Amino acid sequence: MLPGCCKNGIVISKIPVMQAGLKEVMRTHFPEYEIISSASAEDLTLLQLRRSGLVIADLAGESEDPRSVCEHYYSLISQYREIHWVFMVSRSWYSQAVELLMCPTATLLSDVEPIENLVKTVRSGNTHAERISAMLTSPAMTETHDFSYRSVILTLSERKVLRLLGKGWGINQIASLLKKSNKTISAQKNSAMRRLAIHSNAEMYAWINSAQGARELNLPSVYGDAAEWNTAELRREMSHS
């Protein structure tokens, strides 16, 4: 990380009033940050990204294809791993966002998130913040799935993949960590979904974030346990692969 970059941030939104509002939130609660704003990630320079420790991106204001926008951000996340990426996601973007943007350095918030939750996320930083807001996994967002009646019969490999997904890892990262191909990891994820009788990524993350999912996968970090992301945890995951 370049010297001083932790005090530089970027606000991205195609909606001018949202840009202004997010900048005002940062100015009020984090005066130590120097914030620039942009209507699009494509307009940012390499230097601006390299200097920044925080990006708040309003995806709810995007009018383009959700997948192409998320894929572009996925590419940026892969290149700039020191940045804490905070994405504000609308209901229609939820499925694409959890598939492509969930990772250890990103946080997904609802586009109707209370300001205090955004402030808490920024203050927590990219190693302590929750990976996904409870508002995004609430019944209103996930169309009410009742998982309590489902009997869980998952293989060890399937549990391992779902556990890492629940902790914010992407398919590529899991494949690299477990020394398996992307195809194998995707197959294990899909097999687990079939066993659980769930049919979409959004429903899968809803199960992972449910009380049953957290219990079955031993995932207290879903509710904010920062210790999951330290080096010791990574060593434990690798030793179990």
UniProtKB/Swiss-Prot annotation:
<dbReference type="InterPro" id="IPR016032">
    <property type="entry name" value="Sig_transdc_resp-reg_C-effctor"/>
</dbReference>
<dbReference type="InterPro" id="IPR039420">
    <property type="entry name" value="WalR-like"/>
</dbReference>
<feature type="domain" description="HTH luxR-type">
    <location>
        <begin position="147"/>
        <end position="212"/>
    </location>
</feature>
<dbReference type="InterPro" id="IPR000792">
    <property type="entry name" value="Tscrpt_reg_LuxR_C"/>
</dbReference>
<dbReference type="InterPro" id="IPR036388">
    <property type="entry name" value="WH-like_DNA-bd_sf"/>
</dbReference>
<keyword id="KW-0805">Transcription regulation</keyword>
<comment type="subunit">
    <text>May form homodimers.</text>
</comment>
<dbReference type="GO" id="GO:0006355">
    <property type="term" value="P:regulation of DNA-templated transcription"/>
</dbReference>
<keyword id="KW-0238">DNA-binding</keyword>
<keyword id="KW-0804">Transcription</keyword>
<dbReference type="GO" id="GO:0051595">
    <property type="term" value="P:response to methylglyoxal"/>
</dbReference>
<dbReference type="GO" id="GO:0003677">
    <property type="term" value="F:DNA binding"/>
</dbReference>
<feature type="DNA-binding region" description="H-T-H motif">
    <location>
        <begin position="171"/>
        <end position="190"/>
    </location>
</feature>
<protein>
    <recommendedName>
        <fullName>Putative transcription factor YjjQ</fullName>
    </recommendedName>
</protein>
<dbReference type="Pfam" id="PF00196">
    <property type="entry name" value="GerE"/>
</dbReference>
